[in-house]
Amino acid sequence: MSFASETKKELTNLEVKDCCAKAELSALIRMNGSLSFSNRKVVLDVQTENAAIARRIYTLLKKQYDVSVELLVRKKMRLKKNNVYIVRLIENAKPILEDLKILGDNFVIARNISEDLVKKRCCKRSYMRGAFLAGGSVNNPETSSYHLEIFSLYKEHNDSLCRLMNQFHLNSKTLERKKGYITYLKEAEKITEFLNVIGAHNSLLRFEDVRIVRDMRNSVNRLVNCETANLNKTIGASLRQVENIKLIDERIGLDALPEKLREIAQLRIDYQEVTLKELGEMVSSGKISKSGINHRLRKLDEIAEQLRSGQSVSLK
């Protein structure tokens, strides 16, 4: 089961107050519902491929309105042969939709979120939970990027949902997609805050555990890469220095060098793997800084280049 599916399963088991149940139902029906007429009656179908969400809608409708609700199961005939669950409401569909602030006067569908429905902070959370159950997805925290989104068919609802989410300082943004609109989060911290707001506390803990391990692994990898790069740089410089010192030895002999250069040349030949700092601690005159050692080695490089190019050699 994917992380998103586990999160939704957790949410469908939450107990909610009556006011919050209406807010959650409103989001679920507004985003996944469709209306039709049968025998001069309004028929509401709420469709989902998630059995737990279908049970949630069925239970909330029965609890809030004590009406007859049908739960139908259909088999998809296309590539994804998942079951499709339809929660069907025939009895009192119109007054229920009006109570949930979905249906307005003259059978006009309200595409914005009603302020009356989300006056309380708990109801705002519940509407967001319903919206996530209806059209939400979230990447597994182990994947390369953090991403949570909620799909809406209509721009008005999408913008309204984005404003609602940002009342919780989630920094959500909107984007137009091919068949609708999304409100999305890209920051890991904001995704965990959203999971907390909608009540997915177990999923939040799992997300944070994975994120901490992942971030720590990335930090270690960056550190190792940095150390490896520095080591490669040190080894490369050491090999170049040894090659130049051997050239000097072959052409004029190390004894021709001033004492300070001769000593550091011999130390570099004998200890090719050590750092400049370690070389500075080996000189006979006492500890010398990295910059001091580097200055002497650069002088040896200059002498080697002068010998290669046939120039007169300056040993000072």
Curated annotation (Swiss-Prot):
Record-level GO BP terms: cell division; regulation of sporulation
DNA-binding region, residues: 275-309
GO molecular function, one term: DNA binding
InterPro entries recorded: Homing_endonucl, Sporu_reg_WhiA_N_dom, Sporulation_regulator_WhiA, Sporulation_regulator_WhiA_C, WhiA_LAGLIDADG_dom
Keywords of the record: Cell cycle, Cell division, DNA-binding
A UniProt-annotated Pfam family: HTH_WhiA
Protein task: Involved in cell division and chromosome segregation.
Listed NCBIfam families: DNA_bind_WhiA
Family: Belongs to the WhiA family.
Protein name: Probable cell division protein WhiA
Lineage of the species this protein comes from: Bacteria, Bacillati, Bacillota, Bacilli, Bacillales
